[in-house]
Design a protein with these regions (language model features):
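Non-catalytic substrate-recognition and accessory regions of acyl/acetyltransferase enzymes
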Residues: 1-158
Length: 158
């Protein structure tokens, strides 16, 4: 299912993946592929350096707070509105934060989840505030019990 077409020809889709029906794909201007956490964490870190971590995190939280188990077109519109603050990078912001939003919806729909969208928030927090590299943040939770990740989230206030 096409979620959004962007002005540069990029298309963001949701389709069946290996585990569920919530696999996110980028298509249009490139070979269709599922974006990796490290790729969008790298972009988020770059936005933090350019626009300030507090602004980028606040914009992320405004999306996070609106995220539920359902895809909501008003959240996509909200992302588009936020993107206007990012000047020449507005399209890149809209694409990356649409992907992050869909990732959070997917996490909320994951069978048996105890962490839901907080797992994405932890990664964003780690790259913006905790000085984790995008690779370290993307790999942080792999193999950890959910209780440890839950504690890491709680230590950061969420």
């Amino acid at each position: 299912m096409v979620v959004k077409n962007f002005s540069d020809g990029t298309v963001v889709e949701i389709d069946r993946g290996r585990f569920d029906d919530w696999c996110i794909y980028i298509a249009g201007t490139c070979n269709r592929h599922a974006p990796k956490d490290v790729a969008y964490f790298t972009v988020v870190r770059g936005f933090g350096k350019r626009y300030g971590v507090d602004k980028v995190y606040a914009d992320f939280i405004s999306i996070y707070d609106k995220t539920s188990k359902s895809l909501d077109r008003s959240v996509l519109d909200h992302i588009e509105t936020l993107s206007k603050d990012y000047g020449e990078y507005s399209n890149k912001f809209a694409i990356v934060f649409t992907i992050i939003y869909l990732g959070m919806v997917a996490e909320e729909n994951k069978v048996g989840t105890r962490l839901g969208k907080r797992i994405k928030r932890l990664g964003i927090h780690q790259v913006l505030y905790d000085r984790y590299s995008p690779t370290a943040a993307a790999n942080f939770s792999r193999g950890l019990p959910w209780t440890r990740i839950d504690n890491e989230c709680k230590l950061r206030g969420f």
